[in-house]
Amino acid sequence: MLPSQSPAIFTVSRLNQTVRLLLEHEMGQVWISGEISNFTQPASGHWYFTLKDDTAQVRCAMFRNSNRRVTFRPQHGQQVLVRANITLYEPRGDYQIIVESMQPAGEGLLQQKYEQLKAKLQAEGLFDQQYKKPLPSPAHCVGVITSKTGAALHDILHVLKRRDPSLPVIIYPTAVQGDDAPGQIVRAIELANQRNECDVLIVGRGGGSLEDLWSFNDERVARAIFASRIPVVSAVGHETDVTIADFVADLRAPTPSAAAEVVSRNQQELLRQVQSARQRLEMAMDYYLANRTRRFTQIHHRLQQQHPQLRLARQQTMLERLKKRMSFALENQLKRAGQQQQRLTQRLNQQNPQPKIHRAQTRIQQLEYRLAEILRAQLSATRERFGNAVTHLEAVSPLSTLARGYSVTTATDGNVLKKVKQVKAGEMLTTRLEDGWIESEVKNIQPVKKSRKKVH
């Protein structure tokens, strides 16, 4: 008999589903290190393998859209570090992990530490823009914290000498690689702040692997850079190398040479700017003097223009000019009047009716002659057509047929006789000849037999 408050009863499906949800929601994404075994890649492109250590193992799957980002081919027995989600395959109740990313174990562990420290310092606000100190402009002294034998120091000094040879440089030599390097870098930063000899610091080194650059991913170095009162420019490795020091520094330069470019002034450019400013000043002075000279000349000219004798001379000149203009205007007026009179005379001559009458009479005579010619031609053509019509009518007239010896005989009812069967003996007939008619009586009717010819 079951107790009154019985525990929940799960089906197998519900149990597997509940466990899967607990694993996915409670565990979330985790980092796992282990050795690869039983690696397979079917036609789908997915990877299936087992991740194990000395005492345990777990099944893993890495789908194609994730494994295409892996830069190496996993091998049996290889130690790797994976980032994965824990889940459960419900149909079989198999516990497994779904891998999102994979790295070789050594580099992967460093990368994991890098990400953890980055997240920690970012959460504390060490990367916030509000804490970034502005660089001095211009810098009066530059401090360099790097290896005294490295290529980075050579590059920095070469650029500073080329751009600003007079800029003082203080070198704080330190190791940049190895177990002692982080502590030495921290002490060099603190020493530079204690002496307060320079107003900007370059902290960096040349390129290398992740392990080579690891000193600049050390938490002690990051906090020392953040605590520095002197602005810090990080210059670690190449442009693609990004360290924790780059995030904490007041400014990140992609290379040591670029850092030297940032903190220094280009003396050649400054010289060009001074020369340009001098040229602008000289041009401004020349313009000012020319403007003052022109103004003085204008005032002097105006004073000269106000002299009484000059005014009288100008008025006399104006009077002479007006007299010439009046004379010229009068001559032009008379000339225009004469030209107008000539044009009117020409127009009047053009309007004389006699030439028009003569032309009209000539035109009428021409038209009368043409009309007479047309009438004569039309009359001749009409006569010719009439003669042709008469000739044609005469040719088809029955009278013409009678004139050739033929006659037309009609019965008493006026019908023209064509066959002998139309008449009977004793009937009266009328025959039309060329010059009159004949009436006759039928005495005898004699039909004509037609001969029939056989065609062979």
UniProtKB/Swiss-Prot annotation:
Location within or outside the cell: Cytoplasm
EC number, as in UniProt: 3.1.11.6
Highest taxon of the lineage: Bacteria
The reaction(s) this protein catalyses: Exonucleolytic cleavage in either 5'- to 3'- or 3'- to 5'-direction to yield nucleoside 5'-phosphates
GO cellular component, one term: exodeoxyribonuclease VII complex
GO biological process: DNA catabolic process
InterPro entries: Exonuc_VII_L, Exonuc_VII_lsu_C, OB-fold_nuc-bd_dom
Pfam families assigned: Exonuc_VII_L, tRNA_anti_2
PANTHER family: EXODEOXYRIBONUCLEASE 7 LARGE SUBUNIT (PTHR30008:SF0)
Function as written in the Swiss-Prot or TrEMBL entry: Bidirectionally degrades single-stranded DNA into large acid-insoluble oligonucleotides, which are then degraded further into small acid-soluble oligonucleotides.
Family statement drawn from the similarity comment of this UniProt entry: Belongs to the XseA family.
Subunit structure: Heterooligomer composed of large and small subunits.
Record's protein name: Exodeoxyribonuclease 7 large subunit
Organism: Escherichia coli O9:H4 (strain HS)
Highest classification ranks of the organism: Bacteria, Pseudomonadati, Pseudomonadota, Gammaproteobacteria, Enterobacterales
Gene: xseA
